[in-house]
Amino acid sequence: MNNHDKIYDMFDRNSGAKPLICVEMSGNHQGSLDVAVEFARSAKSAGADLLKVQVYKPDTITFQSDFPDFKLSGDNDWADYGTLYQLYEKAHTPWDWVATIFTEAKKLDLPVFASPFDQTAIDFLEGLDCPIYKIASPEITDVGLIEACARTGKPIIMSTGLASSKDLDDA
């Protein structure tokens, strides 16, 4: 059984089976590769079955702009960043870190998969042999992204939290 088959078998759950636990790293690395690696170790020691990372660059998912559509406002923690670009710049995981996280997680026998946000991220993740792709809920209408993930021949998890019935039909 190859490594991908082992991972895919994790999703084959019967009633009464223990839950599949996936830990999301997202921006929880606090801007430190050491924290990111320790996060993976902690996830494994806490019993996680899988680790998920987000792979994007601020320049590929938004514009550096002060126009209202790109500003973060309101009474929430994100508003402190000012713009979407500034938020994504702070929260993104540098791609060389992603490669290190994949390597370190493999040593821990902790499978890693990812949410890519564009073709460049998919190309990068294919180089890491990412076994599964997850489409984030806000990207559920990005048919090009979904098709690009599908072309890899790997399973896709689609988050539907923000999706309407029409969005699901289109996806």
Where are these regions (language model features)?
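Glycine-rich, proline-tolerant flexible connector loops at the mouths of alpha/beta enzymes
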Residues: 49-92
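Glycine-enriched alpha-helix->loop->beta-strand junction motifs that scaffold or abut catalytic
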Residues: 47, 124-133, 150-156
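Catalytic domains of carbohydrate-active enzymes, especially glycoside hydrolases
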Residues: 38-57, 128-129
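Conserved, mostly hydrophobic/aromatic
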Residues: 24, 43, 125, 159
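Conserved anion-binding
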Residues: 141-171
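Hydrophobic faces of well-ordered beta-strands that scaffold small-molecule active sites
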Residues: 21-23, 51-53, 112-115, 131-135, ...
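N-terminal amphipathic alpha-helix/helix-capping segment at the start of soluble metabolic enzymes
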Residues: 1-23
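Active-site beta->alpha loop and helix N-cap motifs at the rims of alpha/beta catalytic domains
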Residues: 76-143, 165
